[in-house]
Amino acid sequence: MSPVSSAAAADGATGAHAMLAAMRNAGLNPDDVQYLNAHGTSTPLGDANETAAVKAAFGDHAGRLAVNSTKSMHGHLLGAAGGVEALITVLAIHHQVSPPTINLVNPDPACDLDYVPNAAREMRIEAAMSNSFGFGGTNGTLAFRRLR
């Protein structure tokens, strides 16, 4: 483990791996994805690590993604969090709206992506992903596409 790892937070490599695997399995390239529902538990270490993972997985496209954490609205639902966030991601595609990350006033400088602060955003969403990250780097990412 790296110095920034612990039993509760891996260093971000496993999160990047989960996102890359989801894109590969779905036949998506990073620039095909417009929206990411991040795990985003609002912890300094976890959010910085997830930001680093998003940058590693999406490269230059990371700065063009709409990234949010809907946990800012519904809280951490433990085992149900991944399912609820996957449903929210599908609804974002259906309605073509990225939900906001509410109460984002003073973001950590290490968290420098477009987190859709405080207000929903109408946008084109053809493909989206949802992260569900667990203790010690037990991570899952689902990828979804708009039906054509």
Describe the role of every protein-language-model region.
Residues 1-148:
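Conserved "HGTGT" condensation-loop signature of ketosynthase/thiolase-family condensing enzymes
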